[in-house]
Design a protein with these regions (language model features):
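Intracellular coupling helices
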Residues: 4-12, 16, 294-335, 395-406
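Alpha-helical transmembrane segments of integral membrane proteins
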Residues: 20-31, 278-298, 331-343, 373-378, ...
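Short, strongly hydrophobic transmembrane alpha-helices
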Residues: 6, 10-43, 53, 413-437, ...
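Small-residue-rich transmembrane alpha-helices
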Residues: 34, 244-245, 332-395, 436
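Short juxtamembrane loops and helix-capping segments at transmembrane helix boundaries
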Residues: 43-52, 194-196, 202-205, 261, ...
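Mid-to-C-terminal secondary-structure elements
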Residues: 121-134, 147-273, 474-481, 485-517
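Membrane-proximal extracellular/periplasmic loop immediately following the first transmembrane helix
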Residues: 35-103, 213-223, 233-238, 262-266, ...
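Membrane-helix entry/capping segments
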Residues: 2-4, 8-19, 49, 238-287, ...
């Protein structure tokens, strides 16, 4: 207890420098922990599914005039079924998922829900290993106008009412019956819909093409059987042969198509942008934490001149070097604890801004499985900030009580100051580069002027309905002009192959259907 009393008195006596320590470490811990947790969050993508190592994603490769394109996530509709049919010994399940046919909102009565939905076949939950809480998707998703909701969306829509059997509306077009509930998926998953609509609902209305000649708009996944050792190269070679047997062989086209598989666990993590951002985030977090630790060490060692006599007094009263060392560790622990309290206050008060900047909820970042990240950061800071100065203080001799301490040698300060200034210069330079890139992207010429333009997704069954809506918007006094297009440039466009007169593929091009203006 005496040690705690002496430590508290020491902290109160040097409260000016200790306030600086708490502020410095609080800000550094906030930033570094957020950055490190974000990296771990990114690296844990697609681990929420059951046995994720058995799930593989299909990718399409188009070749035109001998030029092979990059693998793309969108596949021809029948590919997943062909894989399941031709590899019964290896593949347990396969699924086709379409996103673009489920872009519209869901309605419960007049209440609109713009939650992420997809259309998928009956093997969706079995293939991805998503827990189904109620309902039989193998049977129900073979019927049209059927939907399964996540427990999160079901709670949002119906509260404590039983959602099964209720009828909701998709985009004012389809009446969907809720047939089941499944466990909601976390944010760090590439396929995490809040609603799964039976894809039969689209096929029965001819909303999309289902053939080997087009309609490559489907995300597709396969699940290998337990115990199957997947040699990706050999499997892809066999898959290429299977796909070739299904493709039309009319001899007129100079293009070809094949599919490959990649482990779902690696698809997101292996992206160039993800790897680059993780590297930058990790370096920035380490730099911030290192600078804060060096700042703490520098402030602590700087107090050596006026704390040396106090340490000597403790030793005259029987304190050993270990006791002095433990007192300094306790002091460091209290400072770090106060810094953690400051960090929590910052996270709570700036939560909305942090979540908007990081594009993920704090509750998703700080789950139980990632608590080790802040613990490791705090432990590392405690070792660097407590052990190094603590050993210096514990070695002060008893004779220091009878001497006037003068700080004759200052060479030890210069390396620390150099490292600190170097780190600050690095972070400032990195932030300047990031701000310059942000300014460039924000002001880059996109080819169109987005000022005073409002966009919305509206689907019409006929040209007459579209024209009527256009006349309505044109009649509004605050509207200058109205235009409609199948794929606005700010959203993206679909693609199609351009043929010559003989039917040979020349190239693939983006296209957009628009009205006369």
């Amino acid at each position: 207890m005496k040690q705690i009393y002496y430590v508290i008195q020491t902290l109160l006596r040097g409260r000016g420098s200790n306030i600086i320590k708490v502020l410095s470490l609080g800000l550094a811990l906030t930033m570094s922990i957020l950055l490190f947790v974000r990296v771990v969050f990114e690296q844990s993508y697609d681990t929420c599914y059951r046995d994720p190592d058995r799930i593989y994603q299909l990718f399409s490769i188009f070749t035109i005039n001998g030029e092979q394109g990059e693998p793309g996530e969108l596949n021809l509709p029948p590919v997943a079924g062909a894989v399941l049919e031709n590899f019964p010994q290896e593949v347990e399940a396969a699924v086709s998922v379409c996103k673009y046919m489920a872009f519209g909102p869901l309605y419960n009565g007049s209440v609109r829900f713009k939650d992420y939905a997809v259309m998928a076949d009956s093997l969706f939950f079995q293939t991805l290993g998503i827990e189904v809480l109620r309902g039989d998707p193998l049977h129900e998703l073979q019927q049209k106008d059927v939907v399964f909701l996540s427990d999160r969306l079901a709670q949002k829509m119906f509260g404590d009412e039983d959602p099964v059997g209720k009828v909701i509306n998709y985009d004012k077009q389809l009446q969907l019956t809720v047939k089941g509930i499944y466990a909601a998926l976390p944010e760090n998953s590439t396929m995490n819909p809040e609603a799964v609509i039976s894809i039969v609902s689209a096929w029965s209305r001819d909303w999309a093409e289902y053939s080997w000649e087009g309609g490559d708009s489907f995300f597709q996944y396969i699940r290998f059987r337990p115990g199957v050792k997947v040699d990706v190269e050999k499997f892809n070679a066999r898959l290429e042969t299977v796909i070739h047997n299904y493709l039309p062989q009319d001899g007129k086209d100079n293009s070809s198509y094949t599919s490959i598989v990649k482990p779902l666990r690696d698809v997101y993590r292996s992206g160039d942008m993800v790897k680059r951002m993780n590297a930058i985030t990790l370096i920035l977090g380490l730099a911030i934490l290192f600078i804060a630790a060096m700042n703490y060490v520098l402030i602590s060692i700087s107090s050596l001149s006026y704390r040396a006599k106090a340490v000597g007094v403790h030793k005259c009263n029987g304190a050993s070097g270990g006791t002095v060392f433990s007192m300094f560790l306790l002091e460091t622990g209290i400072v770090i604890l106060l810094s953690l309290i400051l960090m929590v206050l910052l996270l709570l008060n700036f939560r909305e801004m942090i979540e908007e900047t990081m594009e993920v909820r704090l509750t998703s970042l700080f789950v139980f499985g990632r608590i080790w990240v802040p613990l490791v950061v705090v432990l590392g800071l405690f070792i660097v900030g407590g052990v190094l100065p603590g050993r210096m203080f514990s070695r002060i001799p008893v004779s220091q009580v009878f001497r006037h301490y003068t700080e004759g040698k200052k060479g030890w300060k210069r390396p620390l100051l150099f490292i600190q200034f170097l780190g600050v210069a690095f972070i400032c330079g990195l932030m300047c580069v990031i701000m310059a890139q942000y300014h460039y992207v924000l002001n880059k010429n996109t080819g169109y002027d987005a000022r005073s333009i409002a966009t919305s997704d509206i689907y019409f069954d006929s040209d007459s309905e579209r024209d009527a809506a256009r006349q309505f918007f044109c009649g509004l006094p605050y509207v200058e002009d109205v235009e409609s297009a199948s794929y606005p440039p700010c959203i993206g466009m679909s693609g199609m192959r351009i043929m010559d007169e003989s039917g040979q593929s020349l190239f693939s091009s983006r296209y957009c259907v628009e009205t006369e203006n």
